[in-house]
């Protein structure tokens, strides 16, 4: 069996931290032939879909062979693991991968869902599980909401890994000017969400496979910051899921399955859903290190069962 990973250039990956590296290594341990390419390596000539890909020896990390042009139908599964931003190149790649899916190839996550699920806006499908939230472009509406909530977090809809998050008081001087900046003079919507003080104790990244939680890690912000993302200096800690968090997972599960979102990372703060990460969820390495479980192997095993 062959699997293809569509992701950032391999030389950019830090194997000790990267979930894609963990998945490739687990696939290799399962006797799967692992190949890799970037979105720019995908192509279609008529109805012939292919990728200029390299064979990967993922463990020990990493060696590659010579690039070859291979039909996408040669792969039992294609993982779309390119990190955001979800820009034009990313979107075009999902269109090509959707053609492969129509040709019978399993593509994870489903390309149409990757286009449809903005990682901030997707959570609004479950707004009953979230903190009070407003998405808007009008400064007057955003400012009124911020004053109502007293303290909020501004979230650019295209941000990732904590980039661009701003904590601000509703009564802060210059609030309107800040909102003008983040909305590009009311040309772009932004998410404004009630600030949850419990985030200082951390948020939970929960990894779901086919709708079921397989692992979780608590991410505690560094001193003086409220952003718990590991890329922003957050510290990973072992954790267990409580009944509320299991309830959130259970409510998401049927929708994630129906949408073809096989591998997803959700963020939960104080029992409230914050984000649903579908592009290239991280956290495998941290769960494996803190809990001593072979999480990546479990993900690949679930995939092999689903492939039959």
From Swiss-Prot:
**Which prosthetic group or cofactor does it need?**
Mg(2+); Mn(2+)
| GO MF annotation terms | ATP binding; glutathione synthase activity; metal ion binding
Q: How the cofactor binds, per note?
A: Binds 1 Mg(2+) or Mn(2+) ion per subunit.
Domain of life according to the entry = Bacteria
Which Pfam family would be a valid example here? GSH-S_N
Identify its protein family.
Belongs to the prokaryotic GSH synthase family.
Q: Which residues bind ATP?
A: 146-202
Report the GO terms under cellular component.
cytoplasm
Q: Which residues does the record give as Mg(2+) binding sites?
A: 275, 277
Organism source for this protein? Prochlorococcus marinus (strain MIT 9313)
Q: In which pathway does it act?
A: Sulfur metabolism; glutathione biosynthesis; glutathione from L-cysteine and L-glutamate: step 2/2
Q: What is its EC number?
A: 6.3.2.3
The enzyme's main class, written as a single word, is: ligase
Q: Kindly indicate whether the keyword Manganese belongs to this entry.
A: yes
Q: Which UniProt keywords apply?
A: ATP-binding, Glutathione biosynthesis, Ligase, Magnesium, Manganese, Metal-binding, Nucleotide-binding
Q: Where is the signal peptide?
A: none
**What positions does the domain ATP-grasp occupy?**
120-304
Protein name according to UniProt: Glutathione synthetase
The UniProt catalytic activity note for this protein reads: gamma-L-glutamyl-L-cysteine + glycine + ATP = glutathione + ADP + phosphate + H(+)
By its UniProt entry, which InterPro entries does this protein fall under? ATP-grasp, ATP_grasp_subdomain_1, Glut_synth_pro, GSHS_ATP-bd, GSHS_N, PreATP-grasp_dom_sf
